[in-house]
Curated annotation (Swiss-Prot):
NCBIfam families in alphabetical order: dnlj, PRK07956.1
Pfam families: BRCT, DNA_ligase_aden, DNA_ligase_OB, DNA_ligase_ZBD, HHH_2, Nlig-Ia
Source organism: Saccharopolyspora erythraea (strain ATCC 11635 / DSM 40517 / JCM 4748 / NBRC 13426 / NCIMB 8594 / NRRL 2338)
Keywords of this entry: DNA damage, DNA repair, DNA replication, Ligase, Magnesium, Manganese, Metal-binding, NAD, Zinc
Function: DNA ligase that catalyzes the formation of phosphodiester linkages between 5'-phosphoryl and 3'-hydroxyl groups in double-stranded DNA using NAD as a coenzyme and as the energy source for the reaction. It is essential for DNA replication and repair of damaged DNA.
Broad enzyme group: ligase
Keyword DNA-binding recorded: no
Entry GO terms, CC: cytosol
Gene Ontology molecular function, alphabetical: DNA ligase (NAD+) activity; metal ion binding
Organism phylogeny: Bacteria, Bacillati, Actinomycetota, Actinomycetes, Pseudonocardiales
Chain ranges of the BRCT domain: 636-725
Family the entry assigns: Belongs to the NAD-dependent DNA ligase family. LigA subfamily.
Matches recorded under HAMAP family: DNA_ligase_A (MF_01588)
Name listed for the protein in its UniProt record: DNA ligase
Amino acid sequence: MTSNDPADPADRAEFDDAAVAGMTSEAEAGATAEGVEDVPAGVRERYADLVEQVRAHQFRYYVLDSPTISDGEFDELFTELQTLESDHPALRDPDSPTQVVGGTFSTDFTAVDHLERMLSLDNAFDPDELRAWVERVEREVGSSAHYLCELKIDGLAINLLYRDGKLERALTRGDGRTGEDVTLNVRTMDDVPDQLTGTDEYPVPALVEIRGEVFFRVDEFAQLNASLVEAGKPPFANPRNSAAGSLRQKDPRVTKSRPLRMICHGLGKREGFEPKQQSESYAALRAWGLRVSPHTKVLSTVDEVLEHIDYWGKHRNSAEHEIDGVVVKVDEVSLQRRLGATSRAPRWSIAYKYPPEQATTRLLDIQVAVGRTGRVTPYAVMEPVKVAGSTVARATLHNADQVRHKGVLIGDRVVIRKAGDVIPEVLGPVVDVRDGSEREFVMPTECPDCGTALAHQKEGDVDLRCPNSHNCIGQRRERLFQLAGRKAFDIEVLGYEGVSALLSAGVVFDEGDLFDLNEEALLKTTLFRTDDGSLSVNGGKLLANLESAKQQPLWRVLVALSIRHVGPIAARVLAREFGSLDRIQEASEEELAAGEGVGPTIATAVREWFDVDWHREIVRKWSEAGVRMADERDESIERHLTGLSIVVTGSLEGFSRDEAKELIMARGGRAAGSVSKKTAFVVVGESPGSKYDKAVQMKVPVLDEDGFRVLLEQGPEAAAEAALPAE
């Protein structure tokens, strides 16, 4: 089935939508409604035969990759099926291969519980960690095991519920216990049958939850982006995020227009089917009409597993989809049961994560950007290149000294990597391919935004800064953008475009004016007003967000002030120690530096910030506008965590990460970001990552969420008794 074939999932949406429109108009034009019993028997028989044939050929094409008819022959069958449904609307039912959800589309994404919890996976990052996991497994079960290895797809986890073979519900993973109902959208995907098939060996079970991953194929994602660019629309950043966004569309027709795929990799709750091996469950999934990865392999030793992992590490770009590792599972289900699970992950499975990818590309230019504190940072402009699952075209170069240190020239071929698979970094040039056309980067002497001469803030400082902090539009824009972020006032609708609109219209000069905004001011901007001159929906949301932001805790206000070196951690300490902005402003450097984790550098920065007249004017304006400048202290809270360093990792159900840190600090503790010998406890939620592994290795007490509550309410001695057993 070629990409030009209407039966191909990449192109079928438009074809089906046209058919639906035709069927709707004919049904509406009919004088009387035709019932199924009114359809001639021969037509009903032909329709049933076509449905069966189309399903079978889709199964052979999409699942078995072994079609038995040509693309043209399949197209004829599919078109005939559509024609019969158009001529006889009564024949249409939800199980038809041509099903398109018609009328007014609405997906509310209702929260629904999974029948069986969807756990996350522990990770291994090197061969020694994987060997240690295998040793633990075989020590626990008292014998050797077989290991099923499969590619770790970088997609969106999904849970399908089939009852008597019929798709009843599709949920996103959510928090593992509860997911979002995306059934209408999932029904539009060709890889997800409405009705399971079955064989004598593997009949369809009475009930089964099927877990899998929704993704874009690499080539189809590229085609999708090319079509978007051709249409004058911005391309998607990476396949994983665009797959998630495509599946969560409110209009299922949009989802259907995207070439989403799904590969199944496990079962949840089931009735009427008990496999003996994980690999047997995959054979059953294939028999039921679902896709399973063709790259799954069962191996007997850890050396074989590592060899398999090494192979895919070298060939990860040859898979049809993005991968970020290999999942290793104990194949025997009886051993899986004996191994059990922790509160967050099965003990019988682990994900081996690959290190960040590297790639080479052309360095087209080096430009500079001005930050919120005036720092002028050079960044690389490159030919777009695929690295670690996303397309990279820019990367920071930090400062002019780093450019010289790396030895990169404009026009070079450069090696880049994504540190932590997130932040693009230029490692250095490929010197051997230089042809003499390359040129050195010259750091500008003037601010690119306001023209002010750049200078070092102090002797020995490697960074150049624009000293025009109050009037430089670049700095004002960055400060406003930063204060709206999640770690400051968390003003949802005030993004970069909104900040630029406010500055361009002149309704704010700097951050001091932000909380004086009203409807009259927003109507002066094109972004926050409608074509008829009224306030837009986002304009109304912005005013509501600003009102809510006035009640944010003191530490967020401190972050929003853009005081150099003061991030969320230092801000929390200052807020906890002093309680109000007035007391912070009145404190000496020595008093400020006394807070744990503050020190002289931050204390000096705070003192110098308050010495500037226009900085104090911002505080005055915010205070007069009603921004909360002091925290209410609960004197009843015992400070029984004083002096203790506590690390929180993973997702907690009852607390956000910020809330957990605030509760720790309110009791005198330090919310640390890494595990060390000084760590008193590590609190783990879902997907805790390497911090949990390090805690186990260093024998630091580990608390689950219940243990964390004990720590908060009863103190460290009681929490030590509630710690999870050492693995």
